[in-house]
A protein has these predicted regions:
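The feature marks non-catalytic terminal segments
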Residues: 4-8, 153-212
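Active-site beta-strand->loop->alpha-helix modules in alpha/beta enzyme cores, enriched
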Residues: 1-152
Length: 212
């Protein structure tokens, strides 16, 4: 994929002498894997669950999909959700994507470790959940905390005062239908009628998505 790999004579760690960013020197097997898979991606989106990328950042990915690496922190062992996520990534022509296998829970006991993926190269843009977890989800808050631990230079999901342009909204809704297993939750987010939904806003993230 356009790289020549050399090895540091003292540490035996691999690094690249040719490529878009020759200053990148992966220090672990994982960052070496990232460097090979992600040399064309310049933007990073980190989400807690499959469908978060569409609900909160769908239009961003519709516009800039090939530039993004998308990291989903949970559900790698859930074959249904993994398959749905893969379908969405392919439809959006995402440059690179990965699912990790942290537990999907409303009562998390394990923090996310994102040091490798955030720090191995200089991302043009990093996007993740906001500090209140959008509607209060604990794992969304943890994702924000994990990103903030590694960098202060990032964007978060937010809501615009204006509804999305209709063409983008129509395509976003079409893509959301690929998450068949999550339709009840997606509908609750749109109508804000779930007992777990912590929001006094008249708007919802699906129709009023923004990144700030």
């Amino acid at each position: 994929k356009g790289f020549d790999v050399m090895y540091d004579k003292l540490t035996l760690q691999p690094y690249f002498i040719h490529g878009p960013d020759p200053s990148v020197k992966p220090k672990t097997a994982k960052t070496l894997e990232y460097a090979f898979n992600d040399y064309q991606t310049t933007k990073l989106m980190i989400i807690s669950h499959p469908d978060d990328e569409l609900i909160f950042g769908g239009v961003e990915l519709i516009k800039h999909g090939p530039e993004y690496k998308v990291i989903c922190l949970t559900n790698n062992s859930n074959n249904i959700r993994k398959s749905e996520f893969k379908s969405v990534m392919e439809k959006l022509n995402i440059g690179s994507w990965e699912m990790l296998n942290y537990e999907d829970t409303l009562h998390p006991t394990q923090k996310f470790n994102l040091q490798d993926i955030i720090t191995y190269k200089n991302w043009d843009k990093i996007v993740t959940h906001n500090p209140i977890g959008e509607y209060g989800h604990p794992q969304h808050k943890l994702a924000f905390d994990a990103v903030k631990k590694e960098t202060n230079n990032f964007y978060v999901f937010s809501k615009s005062n204006e509804k999305l342009e209709q063409d983008y909204l129509d395509y976003k809704v079409e893509l959301l239908r690929l998450y068949k297993s999550e339709q009840p939750v997606i509908n609750q987010i749109k109508t804000k009628n779930g007992s777990w939904f912590k929001s006094n806003s008249d708007t919802n993230y699906i129709e009023y998505e923004s990144i700030t």
